[in-house]
Amino acid sequence: MAENIVKKYPWLSITTTLEKYIEPDYYDKILKNYIFNGKHDLDFLKEAAESVADAANIVEFGPGTGRATSVVIAAIKDIKSLTLVELSDRMLEKCKERFSSKKFIEYINSDTIDFILSNNKQFDFAFSLWSFSHSVHQSLKSLGLEAGKIKVREAITKLLTNSLKPGGSFFLIHFDSLSQEQSISIKQRRKDNFVFQENTQQSPSKLLIDEILAKLKNNRDIDFGCQHFIGEPIKFNSMDEALEYYLNFHMESHFNESKNIQVILEELTNDIKKFQSLDGSIKITPGCFIYNIARKN
């Protein structure tokens, strides 16, 4: 990477792998608040958790630094077991530190889809905020679209018809790939991930999840609801802040050592400028889909 680019953008020196992800403290520092209809994403989770307040056995997919985990622990008082499934060993270690007094937590260092396929436990409640799609897309990328879809269909079907106890539920927040926020990111992700080639429809993860849910509902295995939200604009004080957020959060620093980083920076800057005010501040609107899925008794 050209030295002058790193000098201009010091945060480009941050590099990670899929398994490592960015440092937990840095993640918490740059993470923005996501607000939909006046409620934070965690507020929706809190409502879902309170509706299953008697859940004893719980699993979370992709806890990150544990911000959603804390909400569920507070909402459900008599948890017997809570399984945290996290691919990033850094994030998992952060959770171990954060919840060291919670002896009912089991920590699993694994990809979500792989865990579901190998798991034999049953759960009353499962939840995942934003990260579930990462595992789906990784399966599609590593195995190819057709083989990956077979694996993902098997995993999600198993989760909803076997891993969940009868009457159990799954709460999922999935990004809206056609939102202003995600459209900018996915345009760049197409450069290294063939699963994002279509730009006029939702992500392969969203389409695949919807396909599976429709089939299981038709078979009377589950019931589910899905709400689409357009959120309050994500605010950045400067172009530098916005670029850092996109490259190190949305794009997980995977492009920071790319030989094409200068082109990527220029393209991102041009796309983000469309949302920049005269005072230099930037407002970009996010979107999401919130699923509440229940296995039938």
Residue spans for each PLM region:
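A short SAM/SAH-binding and catalytic strip from SAM-dependent methyltransferases
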Residues: 124-151
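Conserved class I S-adenosyl-L-methionine
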Residues: 1-53
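Core SAM-dependent methyltransferase catalytic element
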Residues: 286-297
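Class I SAM-dependent methyltransferase SAM/SAH-binding core
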Residues: 59-115
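Local beta-strand N-terminus motif with an aromatic residue
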Residues: 55, 122-123
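Conserved catalytic/acceptor-binding region of the Class I
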Residues: 158-162, 167-232
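A short glycine-rich, Lys/Arg-flanked "PGG" loop and its adjoining helix->strand segment in the class I
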Residues: 144-166
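C-terminal helical/coil "lid" or tail adjacent to the Rossmann-like core of SAM-dependent
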Residues: 228-278
